[in-house]
Amino acid sequence: DLWNSIKDMAAAAGRAALNAVTGMVNQ
């Protein structure tokens, strides 16, 4: 449903942000 879709998008955005920060730190 809509709530699960929102949670999935939020989780994906959180992982993407974490990956971006990790990538910047590793450089």
Swiss-Prot record:
Coiled coil location: none
Signal peptide: none
Domain of life: Eukaryota
GO biological-process terms attached to the record: defense response to bacterium; defense response to fungus; killing of cells of another organism
Keywords of this entry: Antibiotic, Antimicrobial, Cytolysis, Fungicide, Hemolysis
InterPro entries: Dermaseptin_dom
Cystine pairings recorded for this chain: none
UniProt function note: Has antimicrobial activity against the Gram-positive bacterium M.luteus and the yeast C.albicans. Has hemolytic activity on human and duck erythrocytes.
Protein name, entry field: Dermaseptin-like peptide
Provenance organism: Schistosoma mansoni (Blood fluke)
